Amino acid sequence: MKAILVAGGHGSRMLPFTRYTHKTLLPLYNRPVIDYALATIRRSGISDITIIGNQFIGQIAQHVGTGLPGETIHYVIEEEPLGVHHALNLARPHVEGSRILLYFSDNITTIELTDTVQKFINSKKAPGCALIGRIVEDPERFGIAVFDNNQKLIDIIEKPKNPPSSFAIGGIYIYDESFWNRLDSVVAEKGAKMSISDINRTYVTEGSASIVQSEDSLWIDCGTPDALLEASHLAEQGKLSAKPCNIRKGDEPF
């Protein structure tokens, strides 16, 4: 099992700070944002991680380095944002043939993925996909789940104007090996305008998508200054953790 941490894009919601560094290197209380995202991946048991970044990938590599003992860290540069399919294909050589955890770096959460990851690792047959979701107050910003009367997932609508529910699926996903063929098919049909929801929908249609709900977990999209400030307050209160992470000589007590 391998992970892709997507940390590309311009970080336009974080200007002017992102003119000089990557948004994931901005401070979230006493650690950079990326440490919290990596911690969620690491706690799941995955030790092979590919990080996709923009022109500041060198700064990310300087901070993350070779990772923790026993880890394999790959770095991929997205020189210009050409869509999610382009970014993922840059990481493809490092992960194709493996089941993957796909993690978009703005998502800071206390959800623990260990059990779900282990189920995917241990499954002898293709396990489909696991969609990590939660109830949100602004469903227009997310891929939103559509349920039938029996609460069975039947569709996903990307950023709907009239949301059919408040259950958002976005930012963290777990996929079997068929992900890349599905990506190719969706790109062939929809081109650069495709979204992750389009890929997820292929799993939903065939009944191989499951939902993991973060009912009692914190989950913050740290892509805006206000959200980053909120997350910093939560981390200060001990409600968000960046452990395990690299602690170097000279770092603040942690």
Where do the model's predicted regions map?
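A structural signal for short hydrophobic beta-strand segments in well-ordered beta-sheet cores
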Residues: L25, A145-F147, I211
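Ligand/cofactor pocket segment of small-molecule handling proteins
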Residues: E137, N150-K152
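Active-site glycine-centered loops adjacent to acidic/histidine catalytic or metal-binding residues
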Residues: G9, D106, I135
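Conserved donor-nucleotide/metal-binding helix-loop-beta segment in metal-dependent transferases, i.e.
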Residues: I111-E140
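Conserved beta-strand termini and adjacent loop/short-helix elements that scaffold enzyme active sites
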Residues: N54, V76-E78, I132, V212-E215
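Catalytic-core segments of class I nucleotidyltransferases/pyrophosphorylases
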Residues: L101, Q118-I121, K152-G250
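Conserved N-terminal catalytic core of the sugar/cofactor nucleotidyltransferase
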Residues: M1-L5, R13-P16, L26-P27, R31-D115, ...
